[in-house]
Structures are given as structure tokens and as C-alpha cells.
């Protein structure tokens, strides 16, 4: 299997897992308005994936620019950036918690993440909050994260490749 064939295979898995969940207009939050090249590539992959859907992005923003006091219609889906910031290593994770608290009636999808907690009490706090949200889907991008989430969280948990695999292969041939 060539590299391009493997990327195509991973992209197909992403589309099969996520496309059925995004069935309405959406907002995309938690964007990386900071200098982490990997997170910027994930964002580019998310945008490429979303362009293929028949729904409209109503708003996008980072943890620093998103207005979480704004009313969002209940049928609007909230998408949160993927990457490696699920857990207690990065303060930015608190933004996810605020979104989940502020929008209990919206479908929320956390794009593929790596999960890591240094302190068990922080994970227990997240389990308590997130498990109460009836429309939250959390995507893991690696087996370990998937197993941690599946074992501890009561939400829908999916194993989905990193969204950077949705970047068109033609980008690499510039």
C-alpha cells in the first residue's frame, strides 16, 4: 500500500464515522490561534473535511475569540478542534468544559483527540461533567485514548484518525 492509498483509507474512515453525525449547520470552536504547526494542520484537515458536507459553518473561533454567552439554536452542531489537548496538561481544555456546560441541548462533537490526565481527580471532574451531556460525542485518535474514554466516560466514544489526514494529498505536491 502506498502512502497516498493509506491516507485515502484513513480519510474514508473519518468520513464514515463523522459524516452521519454532522447533519445540520454547525459552529467550529477551539481553533488554534497559536503557533503549533500540528494543530494548524489538523485545523486545515477539518476545514477540508467540512467543505465536503452540505451544511454551513455559521461561526468559528478560538477559546479566546468565541462568545460562549451567545445563544446558539438547539439544532446547530458544535464542533471542537481535535489535537492533543484533552485532559489536564493544557489550560485550553477548560474551554471544552465551558462549551459543554453552556450548551447542554446542542450536539457537540469533539474531533479526534489524544487524552492525557496527570491527576485522576481532574479526569473524574471531566467524567462527571461530560457524562451528563446527552449529545456529546468524543473522538479519540489513538487506541490508548479510546480505551481511557470508553472505560470511563458514558458518552458516545469513537476511534477516528487524526483530521490532518483530510488535507488533500495535492497539498504535498506543491
Could you say what each language-model-derived stretch is?
Residues 1-22:
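Membrane-proximal basic amphipathic "stem/tether" segments
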Amino acid at each position: 500500500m502506498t502512502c497516498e492509498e493509506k491516507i485515502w483509507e484513513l480519510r474514508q474512515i473519518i468520513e464514515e464515522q463523522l459524516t452521519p453525525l454532522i447533519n445540520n449547520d454547525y459552529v467550529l470552536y477551539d481553533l488554534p490561534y497559536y503557533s503549533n504547526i500540528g494543530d494548524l494542520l489538523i485545523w486545515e484537515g477539518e476545514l477540508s473535511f467540512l467543505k465536503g458536507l452540505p451544511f454551513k459553518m455559521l461561526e468559528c473561533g478560538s477559546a479566546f475569540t468565541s462568545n460562549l454567552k451567545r445563544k446558539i439554536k438547539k439544532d446547530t452542531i458544535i464542533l471542537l478542534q481535535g489535537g492533543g489537548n484533552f485532559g489536564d496538561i493544557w489550560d485550553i481544555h477548560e474551554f471544552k468544559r465551558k462549551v459543554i456546560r453552556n450548551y447542554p441541548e446542542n450536539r457537540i462533537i469533539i474531533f479526534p483527540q489524544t487524552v492525557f490526565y496527570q491527576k485522576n481527580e481532574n479526569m473524574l471532574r471531566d467524567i462527571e461533567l461530560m457524562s451528563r451531556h446527552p449529545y456529546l460525542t468524543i473522538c479519540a485518535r489513538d487506541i490508548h485514548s479510546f480505551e481511557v474514554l470508553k472505560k470511563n466516560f458514558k458518552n458516545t466514544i469513537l476511534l477516528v484518525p487524526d483530521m490532518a489526514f483530510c488535507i488533500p494529498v495535492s497539498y504535498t505536491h506543491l
